[in-house]
Amino acid sequence: MILIIYAHPYPHHSHANKRMLEHARTLEGVEVRSLYQLYPDFNIDIAAEQEALSRADLIVWQHPMQWYSIPPLLKLWIDKVFSHGWAYGHGGTALHGKHLLWAVTTGGGESHFEIGAHPGFDVLSQPLQATAIYCGLNWLPPFAMHCTFICDDETLEGQARHYKQRLLEWQEAYHG
């Protein structure tokens, strides 16, 4: 099962993420958990989230980039749900062997991520990748949709189809 952890603080203003979800939902075995819809008060039901994760084979963190990072509710979700003894540490093997895909949208182009001595978008994924590896997850190459503020409908649609194709390819590779 593919579990999409969707963290968009303003989902009604989204064009790119909305299309990505629409395409992903056409696949069998996809569950979407919209964190800002489920937890507007930031009071996360840890047991429910861990139960959803336990059913997943592929976990997707889908969100818009905010100040070169993840939205605050997704950060809190990781802090609370990936708990010691469950996701890591002694007895913390619940996520071992599962896959993680970071699916992120950005308003700027790739050149916006040429930062200092460590240029490139990949540098921004390192904390997420380290978290995944520490918890025994298999980190997949990220899916990034850039320039979403200026993309025309045809480009957004094409990128959303590409996202669906990435998910489908994962399903075919791991569940034939």
UniProtKB/Swiss-Prot annotation:
It comes from the Bacteria. One of its GO terms (biological process) is positive regulation of potassium ion transmembrane transport. Pfam families: Flavodoxin_2. Keywords: Cell inner membrane, Cell membrane, Flavoprotein, FMN, Membrane, NAD, Oxidoreductase. One of its GO terms (molecular function) is electron transfer activity. InterPro entries: Flavodoxin_fold (IPR003680), Flavoprotein-like_sf (IPR029039), K_H_efflux_KefF (IPR023948), KefG/KefF (IPR046980). It catalyses: a quinone + NADH + H(+) = a quinol + NAD(+); a quinone + NADPH + H(+) = a quinol + NADP(+). It is an enzyme of class 1 (oxidoreductase). Its main location: membrane. It is a peripheral membrane protein. GO terms for cellular component: plasma membrane. Its EC number is 1.6.5.2. Its cofactor is FMN. FMN binds at residues 8, 14-17, 65-68, 105-108. Belongs to the NAD(P)H dehydrogenase (quinone) family. KefF subfamily. HAMAP family: K_H_efflux_KefF. Regulatory subunit of a potassium efflux system that confers protection against electrophiles. Required for full activity of KefC. Shows redox enzymatic activity, but this enzymatic activity is not required for activation of KefC. This is Glutathione-regulated potassium-efflux system ancillary protein KefF. It comes from Escherichia fergusonii (strain ATCC 35469 / DSM 13698 / CCUG 18766 / IAM 14443 / JCM 21226 / LMG 7866 / NBRC 102419 / NCTC 12128 / CDC 0568-73). The lineage of its organism: Bacteria, Pseudomonadati, Pseudomonadota, Gammaproteobacteria, Enterobacterales.
